[in-house]
Amino acid sequence: MARSAKKGFYVEASLMKKVVNAIESKSKKPIKTWSRRSTIFPEFVGFTFQVHNGRQFIDVYVTDDMVGHKLGEFSPTRTYTGHGSEKGKKK
């Protein structure tokens, strides 16, 4: 179920503070975050975020097309290895 429209978009306060500080200082250093649930705002465009996927941090460069999506959508948590291998099977 989607979030109620009257509540608005969610972004973690600490993440927004980091972005505002980066804008004021004109810093292009990656912003490290564990907040996968935060919505990408237009102010985030052009910044690189290091989003935690449970094991490591994945670099995510934010573009215009990503606005409105969640940061976690661009940091996969699972690796697909495929179903069975043909290698080693005998005919």
Curated annotation (Swiss-Prot):
Pfam families: Ribosomal_S19
Keyword annotations of the record: Ribonucleoprotein, Ribosomal protein, RNA-binding, rRNA-binding
Annotated Gene Ontology cellular component terms: cytoplasm; small ribosomal subunit
InterPro entries: Ribosomal_uS19, Ribosomal_uS19_bac-type, Ribosomal_uS19_CS, Ribosomal_uS19_SF
GO biological process, one term: translation
PROSITE patterns according to UniProt: RIBOSOMAL_S19
Reported function: Protein S19 forms a complex with S13 that binds strongly to the 16S ribosomal RNA.
Region (Disordered): 72-91
Organism: Mycoplasma mobile (strain ATCC 43663 / 163K / NCTC 11711) (Mesomycoplasma mobile)
Any one GO molecular function term: rRNA binding
UniProt similarity note: Belongs to the universal ribosomal protein uS19 family.
Name under which the protein is recorded: Small ribosomal subunit protein uS19
